[in-house]
């Protein structure tokens, strides 16, 4: 009798259901790289095609290995970029200033995750007298324009910068979301007390520890086929993770912001800010020294001070002798000179009705 227990697609071992996750839609936390793309690359290493089915799953141990593989390859990419920058930086053509296009290309020399540079022997072209500079410039352009890929491009994969295949040199912390320039700096940050103390929630799918339940709620997008730059509850998208969390407060409606003066609670930070501004206006009211009138905002207070200025500008009314200190007040005053249209009475309406 055959076993009905699920098995891992990577290691082939049978395990309990709770330790598995479907490979389809599974993404590496932080980089948004699909796990199935990593496995496709390993087809070339083992020289064998891997038949991924919709119900193919991987155990947590193997997923952790794949996550670590992604981290190691990104470290290799950063080191390779530093070496490439050093090689190009010390080989600038003498007597020629570097153009903006060349500088931009040199800054982009890097190898994204899961991509390997294939070393090929370059045959040095024969140079004619006086063509040294042109030949060196040509070799630089060839090197900078070369694409480093390990597989054929897939038309089904998104290519726009706003989609989650965007390649970036910054690495986000999976606990607090802060961005770092290298894996080494990120690991130092994670080991620091400030980051470790913020671990309060754990994903029950991949075991990832994050800052709190709100960050965990956003992290679940990765297991549901979305990115961490999209709202989990609506179709809105944002450019930064912190903006998504700020927007999702509308859906949570937890009223976690409380006024320390009156105890009123709010679900959005800007609502409490406006509320605190009203408290501040009441406690630190602006009083006119001339007439002792009280104002709640600086705008109305400054507007009132103009009425006491002897050299204040005046805006006279063309229909009467009155003048005003600002154009808006004059505009409101002009309405008194406009004829008021009286509403037509019911009797008049009946008199104008024509019967056919």
From Swiss-Prot:
GO molecular function, one term: DNA-binding transcription factor activity, RNA polymerase II-specific
Primary subcellular site in the record, as a coarse category: nucleus
Gene3D superfamilies found in the cross-reference section: Classic Zinc Finger (3.30.160.60)
Protein's UniProt name: Serendipity locus protein beta
UniProtKB keywords: Developmental protein, DNA-binding, Metal-binding, Nucleus, Repeat, Transcription, Transcription regulation, Zinc, Zinc-finger
GN (gene name): Sry-beta
GO cellular component: nucleus; polytene chromosome interband
Chain intervals annotated as zinc finger (C2H2-type): 171-193, 201-223, 229-251, 257-279, 286-308, 315-337
Transmembrane feature ranges: none
Subunit structure, as described in the record: Binds chromatin; requires N-terminal regions to form protein-protein contacts, in addition to DNA specific recognition by the zinc fingers.
Pfam families: zf-C2H2
Organism: Drosophila melanogaster
Function, in words: Binds to the consensus DNA sequence 5'-YCAGAGATGCGCA-3'.
Top-level taxon of origin: Eukaryota
Upper taxonomic lineage: Eukaryota, Metazoa, Ecdysozoa, Arthropoda, Hexapoda
Keyword RNA-binding tagged: no
Entry's Gene Ontology BP terms: regulation of transcription by RNA polymerase II
Keyword NAD tagged: no
Annotated compartments: Nucleus
